[in-house]
Amino acid sequence: MTPAHDTPELSVVIPCFNEAQNVAAICAAVTAEATGHAESHEIILIDNGSTDGTRTIMRNLCAADPRIRVILNNRNYGQMRSPTYGLYQAEGRAVIGMCADFQDPPALIGEFLRKWRGGAQVVLGQRRSEKASPLLRAVRHIGYGFLARFGDYPVIPGATGFGLFDREVVDTLAAWNEPEPFFRGMVVESGFRLALIPFDRPERAAGESKNGIAALASFALSGLAGSAKSLLRLPLFLSLYVGLLALALLIAAPVALIVDGPVWVLLALALCFGLFAMLLLFLGLIGEQVRMLAERSRNVPLVIEQERINFPVDRAGPAARTLIRRP
């Protein structure tokens, strides 16, 4: 632990999972940018159970620079809980969240701070272009489409978790006690003054991406379940139409078999099963919402820490605001 000190103007939170090839370089780049644009700063690295030597490098970075702080989770808590928990542990008057792989350019830190000093409470990086596979882009497009259609607030295409958040924003969202915090959605829903900075997203500097198709799909479903309350009613209406259509198909199937052969029967059954699959999808999302309500009632913390390094003595443990108890 280090002695207590004044609140920094800027906190930069960098979640990591097996980023041994990037973590030292990203800290150096962020330090250079923050030193040139902020009155004072801290860097918080939150490690989500790395096994590739990332933690050893983090310890060395902390030994060399007291402004670098580390939170070591006792296990992997996923792409939503760990990064958000890191943001809640920051003490800066402005808090930036960014990836460790250089796909969120540190060079934008100065522009983020200028927008913030100009009155914006939230400054989001908006992905203008990205070198990604067609399949990955398609999955993201579908995810944004679902959120735009069924979500409870506007969707900002291309916006990621890369952004700056005012102290008031962080404290307000921490008080929401979300068990699976879809932070980028919460930011838009909260209605704080928002500014966007378009940027071209580069490729990873080194290492392999941890965001595969399955991970992105899981992330999108969690975000949709947590931000689309209208889905609670949708299956009621959908089930009525599906039931009527299924009844019509069952009545028409024997006729189709006699007149046109078994092909039409197979097509009818395929359509029927497809519609029921859609119904099950929405029911699954509702089940996810019910699970979130159950998790919220348990008051489980987002993350259980194994260790924290280089934090001042007055920040020796989890901040009280992250373990919110409802009356």
Segment roles from a protein language model:
Residues 73-89, 94, 103-181, 202-214, ...:
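Acceptor/aglycone-binding surface of glycosyltransferases and processive sugar-polymer synthases
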Residues 60, 98, 149, 172, ...:
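Transmembrane helix-loop junction
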Residues 35, 171-175, 226-229:
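Amphipathic alpha-helical interaction elements
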Residues 2-7, 182-327:
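Hydrophobic helical membrane-anchoring modules
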Residues 1-132:
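Structured catalytic core of nucleotide-sugar glycosyltransferases
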Residues 60-63, 88, 114, 118, ...:
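Solvent-exposed polar/charged
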